[in-house]
A protein has these predicted regions:
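Short cysteine-rich clusters marking metal-coordination/redox-active sites
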Residues: 32-35, 60-63
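Glycine-rich phosphate/adenosyl-contacting loop at the front of the ribokinase-like
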Residues: 95-155, 163-169, 173
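Short functional micro-motifs and their immediate structural scaffolds
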Residues: 38-40, 68
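Short linker/helix segments within small regulatory modules
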Residues: 45-57, 74-77
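Conserved N-terminal subdomain of the carbohydrate kinase-like
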Residues: 121-124, 147-244
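Short metal-coordination and nucleic-acid-contact micro-motifs, chiefly zinc-binding Cys/His arrays
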Residues: 25-30, 53-57
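Conserved phosphate-binding/catalytic region of the ribokinase-like
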Residues: 95-101, 303-399
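Conserved beta-alpha-beta core of the PfkB/ribokinase-like small-molecule kinase fold
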Residues: 243-307, 311, 320
Length: 399
């Protein structure tokens, strides 16, 4: 474990954050214990202040997270102090905070930016590839949770093509545990080409084209077979450990089997559907504790009324999100404004990862969480998502 040299500042940092408005105004130098940047208090502008549950707080001008403290609090504004506060406040130390297994959609995303030498209304254009790396909802969530300090275990059956091996290499580079990742001839790899374009009037638009290695225009995915592969996977997994979370985003039978078995062992199950239109979707919901979806994919939430033991989250883009906890009513949380929107792809994945991270930071088992616990978690998740959209690519500033 990391030596706690500056433990005497832990409570003081919390007080300084709580009294953020007064503390920062009286300070000469400020620091952010999230991104560990140091800057003069004069760099904090009126646009950096935002309301929170206790009044007004300042968003770091470097990373847009509300983890700013000033030297008027009595805390030395030094990088080593900020780094220790980060580990203490965000629960990240030498030991990972939790274990999460993820089954579902893993792609190799190619991100392309289209340039128009004669302007967006002209006919000429050139495409520039700016990134190529693992994507897909499950792929992104695993990488993001690893960045939050989790032990993450992707479960994915990839083929042995160069692209399939690239996905595996990227997962490993992000710090994921690779014991449940395979690259075999009978596996599946899906390629996604995401092109950022402009309409003739200059407004942005995105085109997405799927395919698979070898030139096919169709996705190719391989999931666990429910009759034999899923039971074998659960047996192997639980012989080593029982994960704290199981995340899945595809309602195939194999994933339903894994969710059912792990939930009986105490794992918190998180399902992210792209639609709620089949019996399989509803079965996945019944097997899960947390269900998150967008208003674009799932506008009708009436199905949630049939369940009284879950957290439902519907994201609504810039308008924020709605949530329903157990048998409570649907409630709305406003969005976190961001005028510098570059790319909204992946914002939902940041929301998901931050929700899981926030639940672990809270310290209570999911079944004991109440609305007072959930609201700050969802607000923080929206802040991560809002920050992400200022960056190109689904992983934001991690890319």
């Amino acid at each position: 474990m990391t030596e706690k040299k500056y433990e005497r500042y832990y409570a003081l940092a919390g007080k300084a954050s709580f009294e953020n408005w007064e503390s920062v105004k009286k300070s000469k130098m400020c620091g952010c214990y999230y991104c560990c940047s140091i800057f003069p208090s004069s760099e904090v502008t009126d646009d950096d202040w935002t309301p929170d549950l206790h009044g007004r707080t300042v968003l770091c001008p470097k990373c847009s997270i509300d983890s700013v403290i000033g030297d008027a609090s009595g805390i030395p504004i030094r990088k080593d102090v900020l780094e220790e506060l980060y580990r203490e406040k965000f629960g990240i130390d030498d030991e990972p905070v939790a274990r999460c297994v993820g089954s579902g959609i893993y792609n190799l995303d190619t991100i392309v930016v289209r340039d128009y030498p004669d302007g967006p209304a002209g006919k000429r254009f050139t495409d520039k590839v700016v990134a190529e790396e693992v994507g897909g909802t499950c792929g992104n969530v695993m990488c993001l949770l690893s960045n939050f300090g989790f032990e993450t275990y992707p479960q994915v059956c990839l083929d042995d093509s160069p692209q399939g091996k690239k996905i595996a290499a990227d997962l490993e580079n992000y710090g994921c545990d690779m014991r449940f990742v395979t690259n075999t001839p009978d596996g599946g790899t899906t390629l996604l080409r995401v092109t950022h374009k402009q309409n003739p009037d200059g407004s942005p638009k995105i085109s997405v084209r799927a395919g698979s290695p070898g030139g096919s225009r169709f996705p190719r995915r391989k999931f666990l077979r429910a009759r034999d592969q899923a039971p074998a996977f659960v047996e192997k997994l639980t012989s080593e450990f029982i994960p704290d979370f199981y995340f899945f985003d595809s309602p195939v039978a194999g994933h339903r089997y894994v969710a059912r078995e792990l939930r009986t062992m105490g794992t918190t199950v998180y399902f992210e559907p792209s639609s709620v239109s089949t019996k399989a979707d509803l079965e996945c919901i019944s097997l899960s504790d947390i269900i998150k979806f967008s208003d674009e994919n799932v506008p009708d939430t009436s199905f949630a009324d049939s369940f009284n033991n879950k957290l439902f989250v519907q994201t609504c883009g810039k308008d924020g999100l709605c949530f329903k906890l157990r048998d409570g009513e649907w409630k709305t949380l406003p969005g976190i404004p961001n005028d510098n929107i570059v790319d909204t792809e992946g914002a939902g994945d940041w929301t998901t990862a931050a929700i899981i991270w926030g639940i672990v930071r809270n310290g209570k088992p999911f079944v004991e969480l109440n609305e007072e616990d959930i609201v700050p978690i969802l607000i923080e998740a929206q802040r991560f998502a809002s920050e992400k959209v200022s960056y190109l690519g689904s992983k934001g500033n991690l890319l």
